[in-house]
Amino acid sequence: MKVHNSRSVRRFKVTTDGKNLVSHAGTSLLGELADRAGLTQAMSEAMADCGISWNTHDPGVVLTHLAVAIADGADCLTDFEALREQSELFGDVASVSTAWRAVKATASLELRCIRKAVAAAREIVWAAAPPGGITIDIDATLLNAFSEKQDARATYKHGYGFHPIGAWCDTTSEPLAAILRPGNAGSNDTDDHLELLDQAIAALPSEYQVGHEPGDDASLVRHHIVVRADSAGASHGFVCGLTEANIEYSIGHQINSKVREALLLFQEEDWEQAIEADGTVREGAWVGELTPFMDLSSWGQGARLVIRRERPHPGAQLSMFDMSEGYRHTCFITNAVKLDDDVPALELRHRGHARVEDRVRNWKDCGLQNLPFASFTQNLAWVAASLIAGSLLAWAQMTCLDGELKKAEPKTLRYRILHVAAVLVRRGRQLILRLDETWPWASALKRAFLRLRTTFP
């Protein structure tokens, strides 16, 4: 009779006499990246005039450590202790109480300076790993408040908390900007969208901003920018702001009565087959342009409306119009210059906006799932740190990691890279981080450190 092992782990004796062991060794990659990309120094300068006398710790360094801790999985200040107990890797890390003072000292002026500091570091990173075309995705999400917090309000989904809106660079997966709003903030608030757009453009390296100030001549543009949003961004004021900044847009549009009337004039032979990312035909989906059948003058010069129909999947919730037609319809407006047979490509590009849901989920996994403070101002500082955490993870993937880790989500990076244990050995005047040779991703982490030090000497 074959005997099977009925234990989930081996039996072992536990002692506390280990020496030179460090956990979360891979997280030091993010700290070193912040140093080499100039973020730590820029953060120090941003917090220089915060109004508090610091005898031991630099508040900018404290906030950088906080961002690294959030990237490592921290979701409250007490998790900061994980870095403090790894001084051989992270240096002199502040206590939780000192970190609290740094957060409390971060007012609106400091937040503006922090955004400039991150933009300066991004310029260095992008110079080392230039992205392709720039596509910015905008989306809002809901955060529940599980305790009393300033400016928490009832949400449209009958919850209670906040309704932040954020912008991400789809090309690099970086969070560019975010606005923390009360839970009752409107989804299609034009002023919020315009403010977020200004912050997102300001977060780009300086050469990418050229020609994108409101009123700039289009001939000044050096880098083409596309902004995508769902129908919450379909306001005339926001579209006007995008047009004035010479930015191409692709924004969801409601299927209203005017769209339905235009669709009734659309001929069957005018539909084109939708395509997949590899150029193959997407079965059961068709696209068309309704611009000739609608008055889009209120959306500005060059506005176009593209519609898509697809066979609904089982269980899909359809409108009365969709049920009568037998298809599910979606549409969006864009100011893309019209080219021959470009409708399927434009629809494919707009469909890529769905990736923003992954960005939002990863943002919540970087400290945003539950805002830790009662004060709204202090939660603004936490949101700023969470954006830096997301940027550090994205920069590491852009410049240091390869293979499947280059596209991995934060949870995967933590389990495989950031939380790995190691042994610190001193040899002469050199400090050596020894990784377990049996760990499947040890070589990937070693290559990441080598790439980091080669890219940012």
Give residue ranges: language-model regions.
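Short amphipathic alpha-helical "interface-anchor" segments enriched in bulky aromatics
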Residues: 33, 80, 343-376, 381-396
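Short, glycine-/Ser/Thr-/acidic-enriched flexible segments
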Residues: 141-143, 182-183, 256, 311-313, ...
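An internal, acidic/charged active-site-proximal segment
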Residues: 180-314
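Dynamic "connector" segments at or just before major functional cores
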Residues: 1-160, 164-186, 190-219, 397, ...
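Structural motif
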Residues: 20-21, 52-61, 322-323, 373-383, ...
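An anionic, glycine-rich sequence signature occurring as long contiguous blocks
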Residues: 2-12, 16-19, 250-364, 447-457
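Basic, amphipathic alpha-helical segments enriched in Lys/Arg and hydrophobic/aromatic residues
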Residues: 370-439, 445
